[in-house]
Amino acid sequence: MEQQLMMLAAQQGIRLLCGAPLSHYTTFQIGGPARWLALPETEAQLCALLELAAEQGLHFAVIGRGSDLLAPDEGFDGLVIRTPEGAPVWLDETTVQVPAGYSLSRLSALAAERGLAGLTFAQGIPGTVGGGILMNAGAYGGQISDTLVSSVCHTPEGLRELSAAEHDFAYRSSVYSRHPDWIVLHGVFRLQPGDRAQLLAEMADYGARRREKQPLEYPSAGSAFKRPAGQFAGRLIEECGLKGCRVGGAQVSEKHAGFIINRGGATCADVLALIRLVQERVQAQTGVLLEPEIRVLK
């Protein structure tokens, strides 16, 4: 099986690494080695890898920029594929097709520079378009579902195009959340004409707010927990006296209790233990069971 993988990589010019530390490919900077890490540069290469993995029965996982991901300390005994960044293609003046591996924050800036509204909320979000579609990423009153009109994914049955309605978007979830074997290849967004200066000012404001309120100076996976109905996870955690709570190198941020940060040398086990501690304490004191937003690579 591994011989076929190496042959495919050689034939298609795909960069293939053996034993690459996943800590270098996640924003948490945590994780042991991947047996194989593939870095395709095109959608065709990504599809070829997915098809080979399925044919050969390879245990595999697809990641973007690892911004909401916790990789195991023991690593990943299989193939990790990172989605290619590629480049957006404008289909008309307001409609753009964007590869799954493209930066959400970069797309937001690109749209604003062209005077197009609908994605300013994504300024500063460290994830990719694919991850954003999967979890219906959002902030400051905006979310992916506001502008996404379609996406194309790779499924075990072949390529499939989904309309906006077929994504079944909800808070931090989509149809992709329920079908982990559907891999987003690209999305199509329809934006609205806006005032360029106003959009750039809005983005600058969002950026300043993030820097002021979020612990961007430490590695993390963003918000550790989903927002419970009618509540804020960070506020509940703070009210339970858990700001600054620490397990090993993992800590509930003192700046924003909704974040778990890597203070240095944190392990996956540290983070998972801290998540459980926070869940248990918050549920005991408030009756609310917090649902993690961080995904664990399996």
Language model feature labels by segment:
Residues Q56, I63-R65, T147, Y218-P219, ...:
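Short, basic and Ser/Thr-rich N-terminal targeting/leader segments
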Residues V80, T120, V152, I294-R295:
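Residues embedded in well-ordered beta-strands within globular domains across many folds
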Residues L104, S108, A122, P126, ...:
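Hydrophobic, well-ordered secondary-structure segments
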Residues L69, S108-A111, L119-Q123, N136-Q143, ...:
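A generic local secondary-structure boundary/capping motif
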Residues G31-G32, L37-E43, L70-P88, L134-A164, ...:
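Structural signature of FAD isoalloxazine-binding scaffolds in flavoprotein oxidoreductases
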Residues E2-V129:
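Anion-binding (especially nucleotide phosphate/pyrophosphate-binding) glycine-rich loop
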Residues L17-C18, T26, L69, H154-A273, ...:
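Phosphate/pyrophosphate- and phosphate-bearing ligand-binding catalytic cores of soluble enzymes
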Residues G32-P33, R65-S67, F76-L79, Y102, ...:
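Gly/Ser/Thr-rich helix-start
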